[in-house]
Amino acid sequence: MLEANEGLENIFENSVKEAEKRRHEYVTIEHVLLALVKDQGIGNVLHDFKVQVGGLIKDVEDYLDTKCNDIIAKGKEPMTPRKTASLERLMNRAFTQALFQGRQDVTSLDILISIFAEKKSYAAFFLKKHQVNKQDLIDLVSTETILDEGMAGMGGPAQPGQE
């Protein structure tokens, strides 16, 4: 069974917290991008690719704070933000990508790569603006998959389902 790894679950929890903090009715791709780039693992990957992570965070936060007034909740009562259709597409795409690569889990990198397909989103715009290269990320995921499979084949710890 394909499932999200623990790090990805934390990303989604933090995405919801970012939306709640701003009283947004919806969790958007931009909330997810913000949670991703604030995550130490993804932040380190982006830093290794020479991305100015601080500038990316600032751009996404500015967007969420100033351009999303139409999704601010009207009432004062606590509410749980809902996922947008584009966020559902993003997650489905990431799960499909992991499945086709023969992996048993979906990672934060899968979600980050999937953002590029949402061409009309500000999240994809910000990634391109900050010169995040989709192919570099895909190559990194592929390399990690090959290394994991090699370890399992050499008597290393087998991945679930590889017995």
Set out the residue ranges of the language-model regions:
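Histone-fold recognition with a strong bias for associated Lys/Arg-rich disordered tails
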Residues: 1-163
